């Protein structure tokens, strides 16, 4: 629909993770009913970047128009204005240059679109122009003539190929508009001196001095340029040499004559975006409608209706009473309102910016929301999904520019189509109006983008899609809207498509508008063409320089006067061309940033065509003193630097772009980067007797396929590995793809880019990232179960900055996986759950084919204050004699409860109101709340959590029957007992009601619940299967067994909260058993319900989160945040809250590791620990020592290892490698070595000597002794001091503001992620957590 550390705990690596977003987003409805009140735009709960904060403020602050102040309008939108009087030509240009323009209009086609509410129409003209301009200058002393051949494109509607760009090279971001193929046009430019003076309309010839020869480029076809270079170019034919504008010389008068060439226009049918066309026939009057100060809809022309039309009437293809109602009412579509959000991402479609391939019909799936509520919800959750527009019965609101893709239809639909949501309406007329509005908007988009209506519903091909069709034919989503919503109004997609098709034919003047009488029922006539006010807008890919004398920049091409610009004599990108009557314009923007400046008249610029930049890897020589520019064909105002040194210097080129006939290259020389003309470069010649290059500058580049996360402390991204200084990056704390590795001397780099889009960000030093190997993703088709609350990420191994969504619902949810990738030793799967798509670690998934997955939460958070409404987990049978059922506990009287009597229902809420306690009944099949009954009217039991239990059974001859709900009554019996005797029963899930177990499955082709005591398990189903996992024993009152089928049992109390290593599993009568090893070495059987994957404890702080934040905010040394590398600032209230909110942190799979208990060993094997220590100097293969130290002194093994790695520089420090102290000096020449792996006693003023002294006094004569002995100090000094988690160390919730280990608000977050990565590397997870709870 979206961030850092001088301080560190001595035991942690202060690293920061990072990554990018994947557009596998789905459009979802607001979760709660919405009203029409204002909503603020809210960013995700994350550390907001400065730019995001600025964007938020722009959106959340209301804008009002002050009298006398013009509202800003997007320069890319061509807006009509009332005053269409053209400005006069600047006479000063007559004295500077001559422009001859010869143009012929070859084809014109008018398309009219009408605004249905305002009865307004805009005309659209398709122009095709071919212009040839000659500039001639005859030199009496030279006979050289240079000719240029230039290509300009002429696009025809029927030649459009939507797939043309499928295999194109990746284009530079700055070139956002796409061009079709070009036809060659020849231009000849010669230089001449002429003393004749001529003046015609748009043609002026200035006087020239025959004795002075002006400087003219050999290759410049534009006929106008600025003089930026002092060097002469007498031999090159591929450099655009600027031309002098100075007509006055100290010794002689010099005047240059020019004929300006305007490029041929692409012929397109792009209209003035996006007036919703009306159904009127012809334009009668035109008036400018000012922008609204509130809704700010687009400006449209008003038109008068016509009673008759020469066009034929449309014949509907389907019968539709609602469409007939719309036609009869002659419904008009409202204006399109724009409600854009600046922080929404902008990515081009797969064919480029402004190249959608169709439109998708969605509905919001929320009967209680409003259009404003939906938009507000979307803006708060845009990182999950956002769409282009919403429509209801009264309004059309465009929320994102349709030139760029949105996230509403899954990864494959997003890159192709415009996404539009239909907001639910509830009466006949409103629904009809919403269908009319959607059809009108859809037809407008199709017309604007030169697309023809073509339904994709049945064959997966076309321009009009439903979300269901996306799911069926493209995939990446499983939504089926809008069919169910349309059916609820006795309407169908076929009817809606017929209405869209009719609207399109009306807009393109192929059939008669509604409300007119057709006088010619024959085939539609061709649109008539106007002359003076036709507008044509086409995409362009060029560059331009605004002349010193100009008419300024125009916000829209309808403006009568331009505003002054500071972009004169700078090379700008041209992205669009517009022709309005006799006026022609270019839309110009910053070449590098893409910032749009506005429209400029073609006569006010020097224009050149430009091909898309391409990547190169070449080396050239360049002379010292040459100029590097920030853009190709740069001017003196765009100088990047000068080439330093003497003689030839080495220029490493990485990018190349052709401007007209000249070639420019981007690269680096002596640590400075920029663009330079190829004219100034020479190919580096190879020496005849090459010598071995110095190891300091030898470059080796290899392919790579890993992933990386940039550390918080980094030197930035490098454009090339030769750069001496990196650029600041905002890609920290995100997972990026690594495509290449480079070694330059003793420096090593990775080339990192966006995981999903493949966009390269630059080179980063290898020691500034956390790197993991990655295998190629593979396609799969598997189904898993996943718990609610688990995070979906946009990339595998994603960070909290790359969350795609959170699994919703209650109980196990179905996750459909379509892709799998292995990152180091961990496996990640991509799939969809409850309409949300993203990556999940396989650790959080369980296969349905296997028996129940255990709960990850063992100890529920205790309730400090008993709420008036409690959440319970019970099942109840309603008594025959009851006092009735209430819709609300506040109802004074109840309705009859007869139909609920003697039936079983679920209970999930309980509330005490006055002297009565009520429970909320819920249907066990549909989970629908039914109403409140008095607790005295029901018989209740506790009900456990439903778990998977796959098994095959036979029903005993004596049984109680099959029921629709566990513990059901006779009124809920599905099959009688006598029909089930000795029948096969296939179980799929199980649940405990009180102490009785019930199984859910199929028997006699019926599915329902049956008591486990009525079943006999097949002998083949009770066989053990291998299963490897380490659980935590969570029930001190239960037992373990040597044989689960025997009665002998032994108490689990001595093993409470210890780990239990499982090696196999068995399902016995619906109960899951695990067989494994206790810590004392015994091999036993334990029921799955007595085990948990992780042990979570909750500790109440006694204060509110807001109180804790206020204390932190008032500290003398304020909490710090690093929005940019190496730049610290005071964190604001929301940033501190985001970092301290334990509820948010606990739900993040990585950040929750700041609650990992560091004072609790996890009893990991030495073999597992050695995986982390491989290649770590003297610490390698010391896993046994770390394991012994952790057990002996009660410390987490991973924490202990991370501490040692930091202090020893990954086991390579001299302090760790050992030595001795003799006569106050460090030495390695004595017979004894002493080691210190935790930096204990190593004070900064003489760290090595002091550290070795401490080790010598402690007797640490080996690395293992240093590990075990040092662990005691670490435990007593840090962990055992009471702050036994990273969160406690940073925020000290027991006494906020005191004894805190860092000021960086993200210190705990970063170190938590480091712990999580270490666990991932050995294929384990943390087992013991303690989470503070605020009031």
From Swiss-Prot:
Q: Write the Enzyme Commission number(s) for this entry.
A: 3.5.1.28, 3.2.1.96
Can you say where in the cell this protein is located?
Secreted
Q: Where is this region: Disordered?
A: 51-88, 100-262, 514-535
Give the main EC class. Answer: hydrolase
* Database matches in InterPro entries: Amidase/PGRP_sf (IPR036505), Amidase_domain (IPR002502), GW_dom (IPR025987), GW_dom_sf (IPR038200), MGlyc_endo_b_GlcNAc-like_dom (IPR002901)
Protein name according to UniProt: Bifunctional autolysin
List, alphabetically, the SMART domains matched: Ami_2, LYZ2
Q: Which organism is it from?
A: Staphylococcus epidermidis (strain ATCC 12228 / FDA PCI 1200)
Tell me what PTMs the record reports for this protein. Answer: Undergoes proteolytic processing to generate the two extracellular lytic enzymes, probably at the septal region on the cell surface.
Biased segments, Polar residues type: 58-88, 100-127, 143-155, 176-223, 244-258
Alphabetical GO biological process terms: cell wall organization; peptidoglycan catabolic process
Name of the encoding gene: atl
Q: Name one GO molecular function term.
A: mannosyl-glycoprotein endo-beta-N-acetylglucosaminidase activity
Q: The GW domain covers which part of the protein?
A: 533-610, 612-686, 700-774, 776-850, 868-943, 945-1020, 1023-1096
Residue ranges of the region described as N-acetylmuramoyl-L-alanine amidase: 303-863
What is the similarity comment for this entry? In the N-terminal section; belongs to the N-acetylmuramoyl-L-alanine amidase 2 family. In the C-terminal section; belongs to the glycosyl hydrolase 73 family.
The entry's keywords: Cell wall biogenesis/degradation, Hydrolase, Multifunctional enzyme, Repeat, Secreted, Signal
Q: Report the domain remarks.
A: The GW domains are responsible for directing the proteins to the septal region.
Region: Endo-beta-N-acetylglucosaminidase; residue ranges are: 864-1335
Recall the taxonomic lineage recorded for the source organism: Bacteria, Bacillati, Bacillota, Bacilli, Bacillales
Highest taxon of source: Bacteria
Q: Spell out the Low complexity composition-biased ranges.
A: 515-531
Q: Which GO terms describe its cellular component?
A: extracellular region
Q: What is its biological role?
A: Endohydrolysis of the di-N-acetylchitobiosyl unit in high-mannose glycopeptides and glycoproteins containing the -[(Man)5(GlcNAc)2]-Asn structure. One N-acetyl-D-glucosamine residue remains attached to the protein; the rest of the oligosaccharide is released intact. Cleaves the peptidoglycan connecting the daughter cells at the end of the cell division cycle, resulting in the separation of the two newly divided cells. Acts as an autolysin in penicillin-induced lysis.
């Amino acid at each position: 629909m979206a961030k850092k550390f001088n301080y560190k705990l001595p035991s942690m690596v202060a690293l920061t993770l990072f990554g990018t977003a994947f557009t596998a987003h789905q459009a979802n409805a607001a979760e709660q009913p919405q009203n029409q009140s204002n909503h603020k735009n809210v960013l995700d709960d994350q550390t907001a970047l400065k730019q995001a904060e600025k964007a938020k403020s722009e959106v959340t602050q209301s804008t009002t128009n002050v009298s006398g102040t013009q509202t800003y309008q997007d320069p890319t939108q061509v807006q009509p204005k009332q005053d269409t009087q053209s400005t006069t030509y600047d006479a000063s240009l007559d004295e500077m240059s001559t422009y001859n323009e010869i143009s012929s209009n070859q084809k014109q086609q008018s398309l009219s679109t009408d605004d249905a509410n305002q009865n307004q129409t805009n005309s659209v003209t398709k122009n095709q122009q071919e212009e040839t301009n000659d500039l001639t200058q005859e030199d009496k002393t030279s006979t050289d003539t240079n000719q240029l051949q230039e290509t300009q494109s002429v696009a025809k509607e029927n030649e459009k190929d939507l797939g043309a760009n499928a295999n194109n090279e990746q284009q530079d971001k700055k070139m956002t508009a796409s061009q079709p193929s070009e036809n060659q046009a020849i231009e000849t430019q010669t230089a001449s001196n002429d003393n004749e003076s001529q003046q015609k309309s748009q043609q002026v010839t200035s006087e020239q001095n025959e004795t002075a020869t002006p400087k003219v480029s050999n290759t410049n076809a534009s006929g106008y340029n600025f003089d930026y270079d002092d060097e002469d170019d007498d031999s090159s034919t591929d450099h655009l040499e600027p031309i002098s504008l100075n007509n006055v010389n100290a010794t002689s008068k010099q005047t240059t004559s020019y004929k300006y060439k305007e490029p041929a226009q692409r012929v397109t049918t792009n209209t003035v975006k996006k007036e919703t066309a009306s159904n009127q026939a012809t334009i009668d009057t035109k008036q400018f409608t000012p922008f609204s100060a509130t809704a700010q809809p687009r400006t449209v022309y008003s038109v008068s209706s016509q009673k008759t039309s020469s066009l034929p009437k449309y014949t509907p293809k389907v019968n539709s009473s609602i469409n007939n109602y719309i036609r009869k009412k002659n419904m008009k579509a409202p204006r399109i309102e724009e409600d854009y959000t600046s922080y929404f991402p902008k990515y081009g479609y797969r064919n480029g910016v402004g190249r959608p391939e169709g439109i998708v019909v969605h509905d919001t799936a929320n009967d209680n929301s409003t259009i404003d509520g939906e938009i507000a919800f979307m803006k708060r959750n845009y990182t999950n999904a956002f769409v282009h527009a919403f429509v209801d019965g009264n309004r059309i609101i465009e929320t994102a520019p349709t030139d760029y893709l949105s996230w509403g239809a899954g990864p494959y639909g997003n890159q192709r189509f415009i996404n539009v949501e239909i907001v639910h309406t509830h009466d006949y007329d409103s629904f009809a109006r919403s269908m009319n509005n959607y059809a009108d908007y859809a037809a407008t988009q199709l017309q604007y983008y030169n697309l023809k209506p073509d339904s994709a519903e049945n064959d997966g091909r076309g321009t009009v899609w439903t979300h269901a069709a996306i799911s069926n034919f493209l995939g990446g989503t499983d939504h089926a809207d809008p069919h169910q919503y349309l059916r609820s109004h006795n309407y169908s997609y076929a009817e809606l498509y017929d209405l869209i098709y009719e609207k399109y034919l009306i807009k393109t003047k192929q059939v008669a508008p509604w409300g007119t009488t057709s006088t010619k029922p024959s085939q539609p006539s061709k649109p008539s063409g106007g002359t003076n006010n036709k507008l044509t807008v086409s995409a362009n890919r060029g560059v331009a320089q605004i002349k010193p004398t100009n008419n300024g920049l125009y916000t829209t091409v309808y403006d009568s006067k331009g505003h002054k610009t500071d972009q004169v004599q700078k090379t700008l990108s041209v992205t669009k061309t517009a022709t309005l009557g006799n006026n022609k314009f270019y839309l110009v923007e910053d070449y590098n940033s893409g910032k749009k400046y506005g429209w400029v008249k073609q006569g006010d610029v020097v224009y050149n065509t430009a091909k898309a930049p391409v990547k190169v890897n070449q080396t050239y020589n360049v002379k010292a003193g040459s100029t590097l520019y920030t853009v190709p064909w740069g001017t003196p105002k765009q100088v990047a630097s000068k080439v330093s040194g003497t003689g030839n210097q080495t220029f490493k080129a990485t990018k190349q772009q052709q401007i007209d006939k000249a070639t420019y290259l981007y690269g680096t020389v002596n640590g400075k980067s920029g663009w330079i003309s190829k004219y100034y470069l020479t190919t580096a010649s190879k020496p005849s007797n090459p010598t071995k290059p110095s190891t300091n500058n030898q470059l080796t580049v290899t392919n790579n396929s890993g992933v990386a996360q940039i550390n918080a402390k980094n030197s930035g991204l490098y454009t090339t590995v030769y750069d001496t200084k990196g650029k600041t990056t905002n890609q920290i704390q995100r997972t990026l793809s690594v495509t290449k590795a480079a070694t330059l001397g003793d420096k090593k780099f990775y080339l990192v880019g966006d995981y999903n889009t493949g966009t390269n960000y630059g080179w980063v030093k290898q020691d500034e990232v956390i790197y993991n190997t990655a295998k190629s993703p593979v396609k799969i088709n598997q189904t898993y179960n996943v718990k609610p609350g688990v995070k979906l990420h946009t990339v595998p191994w994603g960070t909290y900055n790359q969350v795609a969504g959170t699994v919703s619902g209650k109980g196990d949810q179905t996750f459909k996986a379509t892709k799998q990738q292995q990152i180091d030793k961990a496996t990640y799967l991509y799939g969809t759950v409850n309409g949300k798509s993203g990556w999940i670690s396989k650790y959080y998934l369980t296969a349905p084919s296997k028996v129940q997955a255990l709960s990850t939460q063992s100890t529920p958070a205790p309730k400090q204050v008993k709420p008036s409404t409690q959440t319970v987990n019970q099942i109840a049978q309603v008594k025959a004699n009851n006092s009735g059922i209430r819709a609300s506990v506040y109802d004074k009287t109840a309705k009859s409860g007869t139909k609920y009597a003697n039936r079983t229902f679920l209970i999930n809420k309980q509330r005490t109101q006055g002297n009565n306690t009520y429970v909320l009944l819920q249907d066990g099949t549909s989970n629908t709340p039914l109403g409140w009954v008095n607790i005295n009217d029901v018989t209740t039991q506790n009900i456990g959590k439903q778990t998977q239990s796959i098994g095959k059974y036979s029903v005993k001859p004596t049984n109680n029957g099959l029921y629709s709900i566990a513990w059901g009554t006779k009124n809920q019996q599905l099959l009688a007992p006598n029909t089930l005797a000795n029948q096969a029963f296939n179980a799929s899930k199980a649940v405990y009601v009180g102490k009785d177990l019930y199984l859910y499955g199929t028997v006699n082709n019926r599915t329902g619940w049956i008591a486990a005591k009525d079943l006999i398990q097949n002998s083949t189903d009770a066989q053990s299967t291998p299963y490897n996992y380490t659980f935590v024993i969570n029930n001190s009152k239960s037992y373990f067994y040597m044989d689960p089928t025997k009665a002998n049992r032994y108490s689990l109390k001595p093993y409470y909260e210890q780990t239990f290593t499982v090696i196999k599993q068995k399902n016995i009568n619906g109960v899951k058993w695990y067989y494994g090893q206790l810590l004392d070495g015994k091999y036993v059987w334990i029921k799955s319900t007595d085990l948990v994957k992780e042990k979570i404890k909750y500790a109440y702080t006694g204060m509110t989160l807001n109180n804790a934040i206020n204390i932190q905010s008032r500290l003398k040394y304020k909490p710090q945040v690093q929005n940019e590398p190496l730049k610290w600032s005071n964190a604001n209230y929301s940033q501190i809250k985001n970092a301290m909110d334990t509820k948010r942190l606990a739900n993040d799979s990585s950040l929750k590791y700041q609650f990992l208990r560091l004072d609790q060993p996890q009893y990991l094997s030495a073999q597992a620990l050695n995986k982390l220590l491989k290649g770590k100097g003297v610490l390698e293969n010391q896993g046994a020592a770390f394991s012994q130290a952790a057990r002996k002194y009660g410390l987490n093994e991973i924490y202990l290892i991370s501490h040692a790695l930091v202090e020893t520089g990954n086991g390579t420090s001299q302090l760790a490698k050992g030595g001795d102290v003799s006569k106050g000096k460090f030495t390695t020449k004595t017979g004894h070595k002493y080691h210190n792996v935790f930096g204990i006693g190593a004070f900064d003023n003489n760290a090595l000597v002091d550290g070795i002294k401490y080790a010598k006094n402690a007797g640490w004569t080996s690395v293992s002794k240093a590990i075990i002995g040092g662990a005691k100090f670490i435990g007593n000094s840090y962990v055992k001091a009471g702050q036994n988690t990273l969160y406690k160390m940073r925020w000290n919730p027991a006494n906020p503001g005191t004894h805190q280990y860092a000021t960086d608000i993200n210190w705990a977050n970063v170190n938590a992620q480091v712990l999580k990565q270490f666990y991932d590397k050995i294929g384990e997870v943390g087992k013991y957590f303690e989470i503070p709870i605020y009031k």
